[in-house]
Amino acid sequence: KNVLDYFIVQNNEYRFVTKDFGIVSSFMRMTSELFFIHQPYKLKEGRIVYAVSGQVTLSINLIQYTAKKGDLLLLAPNSIIEMHEFTTDFEMRMMAIQNDFIQFLNKDEVLEYYIGRRENLFLPLSEKDYEMTERYFFLIWDTVHEEVFRKEVVQSLVSALLFNISY
């Protein structure tokens, strides 16, 4: 399935997708046909995902996790994910980032540091870090919806978000 296909999602107002960057403000309201329960899915690009409400049980490269509000996942390209179950109030936000999207950075920095390595990171955020992540997310969301898409601004904001994550 091609995420650039406009018809793969019923409510496109909850997502913004280019060939090297995607952002989803409401995974559940988007009503996607990309993921199904108990269907493994191989990620082509790195992902920044965080839970906003509810709870989900999923496997990432055969390791099971339970994510709830405030949990952030940094997923490496080529990871295999499978959703097992989620509560009816589960909601998450997500960004998908191709490695080419962040080539302007030094290899040891930002996304390469987190997602470019072949590891995944599951990080429970403090309330302060969660609120800051929300602010960064919606600043990026608002920026991609400007009349003119400024890729460099989005790249810098994504970098700032990742630099701000402390663990």
Each language-model region and where it sits:
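An amphipathic alpha-helical interaction segment
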Residues: 128-167
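Short acidic-glycine-tyrosine-enriched beta hairpin
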Residues: 62-76
